[in-house]
Regions:
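N-terminal, polar/charged subdomain of small-to-medium soluble alpha/beta proteins
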Residues: 1-91, 98-139
C-alpha cells in the first residue's frame, strides 16, 4: 500500500500515519520535516517550494519502489510533500512507513527521505530578512 502526494494544503500528519496503519505491521515510523527559523546561520522568514508535480511524483514513486525492493517486508509507505509558501513551524514533508519490526522501519524511512532529497525535483527557496535564495534541498 502506497500513498504519494504533493499538496499546497497543510499536511495532516495523523492522516499520513493512518494511511500506513495495518495489522501486519508491528512498527510505524515517521519523519516529519518542518520549517526552521535559520539556515546556515541566517534567519529564515519562510520557505517556498515549487515542483513539476507529475515528474516529482514519478520520481518519488521510483524512490518508494527502491525501498520496497530493499525492504520486502515493507507493508505500507506514505509520502506527502508541501509546495507553495510555508511559514516557520509548518510541516514541509512527511514520510511514514509500516514494517513488521522496528529496525526496518527506521532504515526504510531514512532511506526514503534521504533519497527523496537527492533525486526528486522539488525546488526550495528560502526567504530571509534581506532577500531570497534558491537552495539545494539536500545539504
Amino acid at each position: 500500500m502506497t500513498h504519494l502526494s504533493i499538496t499546497d494544503q497543510p499536511i495532516d500528519v495523523a492522516a499520513a500515519l493512518a494511511a500506513v496503519q495495518t495489522t501486519a505491521a508491528g512498527a510505524v515510523n515517521a519523519f516529519v520535516g518542518t520549517v526552521r527559523n535559520q539556515s546556515g546561520g541566517r534567519p529564515v522568514r519562510r520557505l517556498h517550494y515549487e515542483s513539476y508535480d507529475s515528474m516529482a511524483l514519478t520520481q518519488l514513486g521510483h524512490v518508494v519502489a527502491q525501498a520496497y525492493e530493499k525492504w520486502p517486508m515493507l507493508q505500507a509507505v506514505a509520502v506527502v510533500h508541501r509546495k507553495g509558501t510555508l511559514e516557520l513551524g509548518d510541516v514541509a514533508v512527511v514520510v511514514a512507513v509500516a514494517t513488521p519490526h522496528r529496525a526496518e522501519s527506521f532504515t526504510a524511512c531514512q532511506f526514503i527521505i534521504d533519497t527523496l532529497k537527492q533525486v526528486v525535483t522539488i525546488w526550495k527557496r528560502e526567504e530571509y530578512e534581506d532577500g531570497t535564495e534558491w537552495v539545494a534541498a539536500h545539504p
